Amino acid sequence: MDRIRIRGGSELNGTIPISGAKNAALPLMIASLLTDDTLTLENVPHLADVEQLIRILGNHGVDYSVNGRRENQDKGYSRTVHFTARSIVDTTAPYELVSKMRASFWVIGPLLARMGEAKVSLPGGCAIGTRPVDLFIEGLRSLGAAIDIEGGYVIARAKDGLVGTRFRFPKVSVGATHVLMMAASLARGQTVLENAAREPEIVNLADCLNAMGAKISGAGTPTITIEGVTSLSGARHRIIPDRIETGTYALAVAMAGGDVMLEGARADLLETALDVIQQTGAEITRADTGIRIRRNGNGISPVDITTEPFPGFPTDLQAQFMAVMTKAKGNSRITETIFENRFMHVQELARLGARISLSGQEAVVEGVDRLKGAPVMATDLRASVSLLIAGLAAEGETTVNRVYHLDRGFERLEEKLSSCGADIERISG
């Protein structure tokens, strides 16, 4: 199993290209199920989750090619991929595929809208009564679907098609907003989604669906209106730059020091996070070509944050921000409001010398002068990269195990950091 070794103490200087956003790519790829024409997506990141979704879509009959060739590229940055679902050969998404990636459950919306039926496994770990998929089920029922749960599968039917509705999300959900927006695109009549997620990835999907012939307005606001159409066509669409990758590398510079240009990054996608990073003492310059971040040797200022839906501070940057706060000059308070159990990185950061106390969904980080390298274990995608950020500023050698988590969401991370002076390498086996 691969691991990554970091020797801390080096500043970061240079240019890092920002890849296409994973959280935008996945729903856009799933949208290919809505049409029998070809959907061409530009700036698709080369990630384990993307490759897994390609396999899942293939199970339903979606063919794909990379720059005109059917292949699974092992190397290369974000690329252009063509997806074609001439016919849906299977409306079942089996457990062995869905269990590997929660976002694959989202195929339920397009399959139901196009074929009138879908049988999709519940994602692994869903407890009855607290399932994250409850919002999806409520929304699809509101569109007229008959839904049963049998043997660990959600079985959805809409024999006469979906019908427009007015649906208010009980709580903001990015995934459920994606799914209902796709499903409602082919429903009869008008659908109004209230308390919808406002994330840039929602806007990116709406723009793509509109290019395919959908009639969607209000994406990026709490109220999205969809006028159903009878069919969608193919389109060519570009995936937005990854705001979480942007924030991650900005935080890496805030931690290690240096001067880095994040090429292709868009500041408007993460203004709140950039403001917070600036408060830690980093200097941020917004440009047409990207974002430049600099930090000299003046130390890191403590900042309190609370994670919130967009446009608030993103939960997907919480772990990385906590890593930076471990070396701040004072105490900081981090409150997680989006997900439960999202402090799994705390124990591993403590192995490096961090001082963090937990109380429910709140963490208090007491900044220390020195972190010391140690072997650590990645527990999930965002936690794993927080350990790398801490390792950049730790004395000696830090080894991060289980880095397959990183490969799910960061394209060639160690190569990008190494090009800016980090002493980092992947060790195979």
Curated annotation (Swiss-Prot):
It is found in: Cytoplasm. Its EC number is 2.5.1.7. Phosphoenolpyruvate binds at residues 22-23. The keyword Cell division applies. It comes from Chelativorans sp. (strain BNC1). The gene is murA. The modification 2-(S-cysteinyl)pyruvic acid O-phosphothioketal is found at residue 126. It comes from the Bacteria. Pathway: Cell wall biogenesis; peptidoglycan biosynthesis. SUPFAM superfamilies: EPT/RTPC-like. This is UDP-N-acetylglucosamine 1-carboxyvinyltransferase. It catalyses: phosphoenolpyruvate + UDP-N-acetyl-alpha-D-glucosamine = UDP-N-acetyl-3-O-(1-carboxyvinyl)-alpha-D-glucosamine + phosphate.
